[in-house]
Amino acid sequence: MAASQQEIIAGLAEIIEEVTGIEPSEVTPEKSFVDDLDIDSLSMVEIAVQTEDKYGVKIPDEDLAGLRTVGDVVAYIQKLEEENPEAAAALREKFAE
């Protein structure tokens, strides 16, 4: 079973807070990383790296450029988890410990 939208948003909110100091309550699906959260490209790369580590996904640079909102990243992670449910389950177990 893939992570729920709320689980992914909560995980992203933690990463975003760690990288930028933005309060997790500000991280909602409709928020744009650049326009609403004022996240620069260097911080976005760090968020992407931590997201890859947390969810065991690979976000190619060309895909990263198209992920403009929190909701875009959530949908992207869910799509990757659906394509490889065994890896998603193993990662959830790893992070539950």
Curated annotation (Swiss-Prot):
Molecular function terms from GO: acyl binding; acyl carrier activity
Localization (cell): Cytoplasm
Gene3D superfamilies: ACP-like
Pfam families linked to this entry: PP-binding
Keyword Lipid metabolism: yes
Keywords of the record: Cytoplasm, Fatty acid biosynthesis, Fatty acid metabolism, Lipid biosynthesis, Lipid metabolism, Phosphopantetheine, Phosphoprotein
Gene Ontology cellular component list: cytosol; membrane
Hydrolase listed as a keyword: no
Domain Carrier: start-end pairs: 3-81
Domain of life: Bacteria
Entries under SUPFAM superfamilies matching the protein: ACP-like
Similarity field: Belongs to the acyl carrier protein (ACP) family.
Protein's job: Acyl carrier protein involved in meromycolate extension.
Protein name stated in the entry: Meromycolate extension acyl carrier protein
Organism (species): Mycolicibacterium aurum (Mycobacterium aurum)
Gene coding for it: acpM
